[in-house]
Each structure stands twice: as structure tokens, then as C-alpha cells.
Amino acid sequence: MTANGKGATASVRRLGVARQVAIEIRKGRRKRLWLICAAMLGVLLLWFGYQSARQVEVTSDYRVLLYSLPTVNAVFLPLLSAVVTSTVCDVENRANMWKQLLTMERAEDLFCAKWLTCALVLAAVVTAEVTGASAIGGALGFQAVPASEGLVLWVSTLAVCLFVATVVECLCLFVANQFVPLVVGVALSFLGLFSMYLPAYVSVFVPSSYFGLLSTVGMSYDSATEVITWSTVAWPVGYFAVIVLVTVAAFALSLRAFARKEL
């Protein structure tokens, strides 16, 4: 095949994935996916606002916001990520339409399209969350969050959400009962309640703990004076690399397994 022929084939495949993503987004609208995300995000921000309103009485340091938000994320976002992914995959599972779809689409394209759809939805959710949290902090009287630190928070949060979504998509595509992926999301959210209190050598094995592990804010408490001191720490690139590598590995293995799956 000539270079032009290969380029044309690759272009067609990219267009195929793009069309499939557009179809998945339309399916999500019919399933009220955006409404579900908005409701869960609203509860998250209400809880965050309640906690922040109590803390602003002690200090207006913006780092309080950057410390508190990952704690809330560890509880809410694993479940939200699981709900998004399960909803995107649920239509085909309920109607047992995989065989019909794979007569029109390559298995790899279908898998990637569903993953990209989840990634786009989660990116929108995380963007709305970080923007909303910053606005709440400003309204309560906290210092403005620097754009660079807000960006790091956005990248860190999305990376963990995508890891959860990748694992849940694998479960959705290989397990007919969609209750199982949701149980995984609930379990990760439950573990998120305790993730900030686990020793580092334990928390690295808990996916929801990475919301806190990737934080750029440190906190120290002086029991004698009962004073909390906030500090900025270097972004833990090592933890970020771990979550990215594990996500890539899970994606590659799931993609290969789905392409070879007997339907």
C-alpha cells in the first residue's frame, strides 16, 4: 500500500471514531447523562461550599481550597466516573447489540470511541468543578487560586477520573450485569472516605487516594498552639506517572482483549 493509501485509511478510521463519539454523545443526551452529572456535581459543590464556609472563619488562604477539594473528590468522583462510563456502555449491554455494532465498526474503534466519550464528559465535569470551586472560594472570601495551581489540580483530578473510567469500561464491556461496575464505583468512593488517613504505603494501592496524593498543598498541625500551617509542595510527578502508566496499561490490555472477544 502506498503512503497516500495508508494516510487515507488512517484518516477514514479517525473519522469513524469521531462519528462514533458524536453518536455516543447523542445517546448520552437521551439517557440524561448530563443531568446526572450536573446533579452529582451540584451535591459535590454544596458539600465543598459547606466545608469551606466553616474554614474561612479561621483563614482565607487559598491553599485550604486546594487541600479540601481532593478530599471531597475522593468520595464523589469515583462514583461519578463509574456512572458516566456505565451509562455510555449500558445501551449496548441491555439490548445485546455488540454483534450488530461490530458488523459496522471495528472493535478497536468502538472501544476507543466509548473511552473518548467518557473522557470528554469527565473533562467537562472536572472543568466545571474546578471553576465552580474557585468561584465558591472567591464568594466566601478566600484568596484567588493561582491559574497554574488550578491547572495542576485540573490535570491531576482528570487523570484519576480517567483511570477509574478505564477500569470501569473494561468491566462494562466484559460483564453483562451493569450493577458490578457501579459496585466498584461505590467501593472506591467508600475507600475515598478513609484515603486521606491511610499510610502512604497503603494508599498507593487505592485508586481514589490519588486525588489526595497528587495534591500540591501540605498541612501541619501544632498541637501545642492548635495552629494549622498550610504550605505549597512540589507536584508529586512520580504519583502522576504511576496513574498515567497504569491507565495506559489498563487501556491497552482492555482494548486488546475486547478486540479478541468472542461475542
Which ranges hold each PLM region?
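Terminal transmembrane helical anchor/hairpin motif
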Residues: 3, 14, 51, 55-64, ...
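Membrane-helix boundary and inter-helical linker elements of multi-pass secondary transporters
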Residues: 30, 103, 173-174
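Cytoplasmic juxtamembrane interface segments
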Residues: 10-22, 88-99, 163-191
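Aromatic- and glycine-rich beta-strand/loop motifs that create alpha-glucan
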Residues: 1-38
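Helix-loop-helix units of permease transmembrane domains in multi-pass membrane transporters
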Residues: 86-120
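Transmembrane alpha-helical segments in integral membrane proteins
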Residues: 80-92, 169-179, 243-260
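Secretory targeting signals
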Residues: 40-87, 112-178, 191-193, 225-237
